[in-house]
Amino acid sequence: MSIAIYTYRDPYKLNKEAYWDEIKECPYFCVSQTLVNGLKTIYKKDFQQGRVTTIQYLIESLYEYWESTACIVKQHTDIDNIISAGLPPVLGSDMQENIARAFLYNREEVFESIRVMFELNININEIIFDKLTPEQKFIVEVFKKILSSEKKNDFFLKDDFSGDDIDTAIDRAMLRARKDIECASVNKDCVVIHGVHQFSPIVLRAIEKLAESKKVILLFNYQPQYKNIYQTWIDIYSAFDSPISDSNVAEFRPSLSFPISYEGNVLADNIGKLTNGQMTDVSLASDIEILELII
């Protein structure tokens, strides 16, 4: 259906945002369990375990086989066997042998690279081979070997999801977080993805699939007073080619109303000011000293 991008300024006042009614009733997937716990603590009954959980649970439910131990072990074995058996001589014999030996030793990096290529659905014919480093050329040859053999079945990544498939995956993710949740009571016309600032290929793929049948809300914290820090987030979310709806709530400031997090909030506020070059605005406690390093 669509992707909407919303920001918020004060994590303690999400319930004051214009979109509050929209996000408090639908499946809500956070970048981390820490964020889940924080939302549950602040908003209590409106953010109960189950409806609110981690995006990793959603990924593991949507791409169940791809994320399974059985799949990972099989793919590791396939890649090791391909490298050990030898590849077409695309490099000098000594260099190719050295790279093969190094990749068998650093097998996890090779495994992750090949997985990402499948997650991105890379067209092998669109790779400009002459622009690659020797190591990259070797990886591409492993990728080619997989694609041209029966081993490609071990790297199958489901892509054809029906609306019912998506709903079932969402239900599984929520039930994994809380076994007694009533999935039917959750509005699944909309899905929230909160706090992601490094979009891995598999997360991007999941968002695209969700957006085919649902409204996907991408939600992130934006503090305009710390533009040097938060500009990266604006740049990342702008890549979705959807307008970013900025918050209309006042910017967050450390408050003694939240004593547990107050000192941490003051520290974060000071770091933000330092990053913006606002040295004179930093509030100093008696045991804090600022040192300026000149290189």
For each of these PLM feature ranges, what is it?
Residues E212, I229-N248, P254, E263, ...:
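Metal-dependent nucleotidyl/phosphoryl-transfer cores and adjacent nucleic-acid-binding surfaces
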Residues M1-P27, S32, K179-I181, D246-I295:
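Helicase P-loop NTPase motor core
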Residues V31, I55, L219-N221:
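Generic beta-sheet signal
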Residues Q33-G38, Y43-S185, P201, K227, ...:
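Basic/charged alpha-beta structural segments of nucleotide/phosphate-handling enzymes
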Residues L218-P224, D246-V249:
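A short alpha-helix capping/helix-coil boundary motif
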Residues M1-C26, L35, L39, D159-L219, ...:
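ASCE RecA-like P-loop NTPase motor cores
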